[in-house]
Amino acid sequence: MFNLASAPFAHNRKQTQTLMLLVILACLPGFLAQTWFFGWGTLIQTLLALVTALGCEALVLRLRGRPVKPALLDGSAALTAVLIGLSLPPLLPWWMLVIGTAFAIIIAKHLYGGLGQNLFNPAMVAYVLLLVSFPVQMTSWLPPSSIAAYDIGFGDAASVIFTGFSLDGYSMLQLKQGVDGLTMATPLDTLKTGLTQGLTASEVMTHKVFEGWGGIGWSWVNLGYLLGGLFLLQQKVINWRIPAAVLGSLLLASTLGYLATPDATATPMLHLFSGATMLGAFFIATDPVSASTTAKGRLVYGALIGLLVYLIRRFGGYPDAFAFAVLLANLCVPLIDSLTRPKVYGARRK
């Protein structure tokens, strides 16, 4: 019996449009949890990203002399927009999202030839571009609604995104405050800041934002994306090897790190159920174009992402490291595929 590996082209019986729609549908549980805990901004950002992505897709296709309607209906641009909208802070200024989304479609996707040709995950290229260019705004997350000092409705969220102030005149800095008057951040941000200030991990994690496995709200968001990821596995939209390797590698690395230096690192459960862990493992790392295509290669690729996530979270300057980890792993895909390609029957061993 011989192992066969698919070529880099898609051969799934499901049409591209169906696959893209299934992935977007699978995002729904995490999206609902994210909207529930962090407000309407997530919905507004996602809709704005959709309009921008589809507009840029149509413009570039027309300039390239390609058919516009089939490409718009295949769902690839829409999926990129959804992933961008879910990855960005809910109240990020609208023009930053437009810049990131346009860059993802025009540069990260079409500069390489369009659908199926991109070397890097377009959504993560957009995220990293914005994070490097606007680090303050990209780390300005709202506190979960249960501990927020201000109730932010749909109108307030839209007003902050498009004007910088809520309907009552509150700035983003004021809206970031929790009920205790302290400026809030994500659990991973809070931990990184506390460790930088000389506190131990156990001291930092007494903060109320760390309630639950991955922090208030974030545990449910990650459970939502985990549920969506299991749906994709059941539908055979994604291969199990990549998310299993990502989560397994991250769990192993974070467990060893926690056992070695418990006062200087997050718990394994916080690594798994905070930040973009489940979104990254099931929806971003599994991009069929930029991920490895061989069976062994997918395990290596996923394990590399999980290890890089831990190392960047532990030693790097950015608390949530999934975008950087995925892009670095994308760079390694040609080498990984070359080293893990099954031998052709009858080929002489070197």
What do these predicted ranges mean?
Residues 243-295:
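A beta-strand-loop signature enriched in Asp, Gly, Thr, and Trp
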Residues 22-29, 48-57, 76-81, 85, ...:
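Alpha-helical transmembrane segments in multi-pass membrane proteins
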Residues 4-7, 55-67, 105-116, 226-237, ...:
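C-terminal ends of transmembrane helices
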Residues 1-62, 343-349:
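N-terminal signal-anchor module of multipass membrane proteins
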Residues 40-52, 91-100, 208-223, 265-277:
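Structural signature of hydrophobic alpha-helical transmembrane segments
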Residues 122-223:
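Long hydrophobic alpha-helical segments that form multi-pass transmembrane helix bundles
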Residues 119-124, 269-277, 298-300, 316-327:
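Loop-to-transmembrane alpha-helix initiation sites
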